[in-house]
Amino acid sequence: MLNFSILGALEIRTPGGQVEIPGDLQRTLVQVLLAGEGRHLSGETLVEEVWGSAPPGNQANALQAHISRIRRRLRALEPERRPSRLVTNPAGYRLVVEDGELDAVNFVRDVQWAEEMLLSDPAGASRLLRSALAMWRGPVFGDLPGGPMCRMVAVRYEEQRLWAMELYFDAELSLGRHKGILAQLRETHIDHPLRERFCEQLMVALYRSGRQVDALATYQNMWKRLSEELGVQPSPSLRRVEHAILSHDPVLTAADATLRQ
């Protein structure tokens, strides 16, 4: 069994440790195949992802040479495996990844499970989300972002990461752990200043910590940023949180309430 990691720089691990894939071209090619998530990818797609607008003169031969090197490398890691993980047929190229072998797929699965658990078992959801978020070692694919397809996949996984963080903060707020996440929430809101849900969660955490003035100031700063940068007003959800703070709505201090609607 191999373990592939793309939530950060590409890593391939065997039971014996980490495996090196030499050269940026081969690393990028493996990343593209992993981004395909089991789909066949055409040679044209692989060439565009690896070489962009400057492909080699004989791109078909160059691609096949790198494919052959990767296939030999993978075969050396699993000499008993038949057929090869790297499949070639008229539809293109496909890297076979078994269930549980790709960290990004495992991450998305765990986040989905945690979302389903959130209302019935927020403590369990929080633990699962912490574990899932710990899979991330850096930006998807690290410092080799690849071509259009890889960049699109990276954006999708990054959005899943932010969603997981929202769910994690919801779980912690529902457990009454607002003080424990306050610093992390503030940092996350600074990193993603236009994401309203983080602002809502920070406002609730501040209010519960006895910092009503800071909670309202956070709203005002968000309102100003949305107006100046996007030309829009705060969402109804964000305005509801502000109104609840101004009216000292008891829902804000209920252990199981996060105002997500």
Model-found features: residue ranges?
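Recognition helices and adjacent regulatory flanks at domain boundaries
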Residues: Y157, W163-Q261
